[in-house]
Amino acid sequence: MFARNHRQKHQREWILWGLPIGMVAIAGLLIASTQRQADYADWYHHWITAGVGVVVALILERLPLQRLKPFLLPIFGLTVASLVAVRLIGTTALGAQRWISIGGIHVQPSEFAKIAAILLLAAVLSKHPVERPVDVLRPLGVISIPWLLVFIQPDLGTSLVFGALMLTMLYWSGMPIEWVTLLLSPLVTALFAGIFPWAMVIWIPLMALLAYRSLPWKRIASTITIAIHGAMAIVTPWLWMHGLKDYQRDRLVLFLDPSQDPLGGGYHLLQSTVGIGSGGLFGAGLLQGQLTKLRFIPEQHTDFIFSALGEETGFIGCLLVVLGFALLMARLLQVARHARSDFESLVVIGIGTMLMFQVVVNIFMTIGLGPVTGIPLPFLSYGRSAMVVNFISLGLCLSVVRQSRRSFAGLR
């Protein structure tokens, strides 16, 4: 029985290795297809970067996460300093200042800040779980620093990732779902203020009722909730005009109707959906997509790699990739549930949230169900910093698997 259980655990670990490496291999071919008419070798760099990432993951797999705890604040401080450096000496591209050039290689600190934030947030929540409303100030303080520095780059997509992983980790640590909903609700109010103003007549009283029923000092809590949402509704138009860059506003507007500017801001969305639709059931074949080969979609090898997948492998290929990500998330949930400590469990759930949020947002973007955000598709999109961070994440999760297995063996 023990031998069979051991074999099953060993086989499950191949989910965390096999799926990402398989996606990287396919992505190299897709990237090569997007650049066949140009003298680029990004497909080669994609595989080389993944190879470096695998080595890093193998090292981290053998390092117990508990040993990282003394270094979490310095790591977090270093990533924050790098985000500040982006503002001072960063490289600007495509209208945003997000990179630092080191030896001719562009490094994107915001990618590494995700991992640093997850690790420190996990340490804070495992030591100080949110049992009172005031306790939420600690995790908010941790996440707000990198969030703000990333938002002003500007990088709206990555800033959303920070918010998603914080809310999920708060819930996983034991925070009531009602409190999580109240934290998220001002963002919903902002969306309603811009799109469906009449919905606030129902939404704001509903949130006030939720605050009254779930928070201490019920009347004060509900009054403060109404004030916060009312202020958000008033401030949203100003934020729309002055808080977002012109191209960010265009992306949000054109998401609703790309045909308003088919040769400008809506071009990416329209061509992406055409490419995916042209793939049909089985696709044109790897390296055979006409829209992909002719480079109808600029920068397709980065944020829009899923459209190349759709054109060349069809619905079946897209479905297999989506199922692969679902299987990866299911395995991460299993690892988080069986982790030895709350800290390790929170790290895994934060990493899972980071990866799956990016998957959902990127795929929705490429099929026309979401605005263009600049969020890459994990293990598939070209991007050196993102690829290394993906494998760092994988290595941390594998470390939890390894330590859990050792604990299980010790109990035997």
PLM features: what roles do these ranges have?
Residues 155-160, 283-289, 300-302, 369, ...:
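Transmembrane helix boundary and interhelical junction motifs in multipass membrane proteins
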Residues 16-264, 311-368, 392-396, 412:
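Hydrophobic alpha-helical transmembrane segments of multi-pass inner membrane proteins, especially
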Residues 1-10:
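Short, Lys/Arg-rich, polar N-terminal cytosolic tail immediately upstream
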Residues 8-9, 135-136, 294-297, 339-340:
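Helix-boundary and loop/linker segments of multi-pass membrane transporters
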Residues 126, 269-278, 390-397:
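Hydrophobic alpha-helical transmembrane segments
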Residues 1, 362-412:
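A juxtamembrane structural motif centered on a specific transmembrane helix
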Residues 254-302, 313-317:
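TM-adjacent membrane-interface loops and short helices in multi-pass inner/ER membrane proteins
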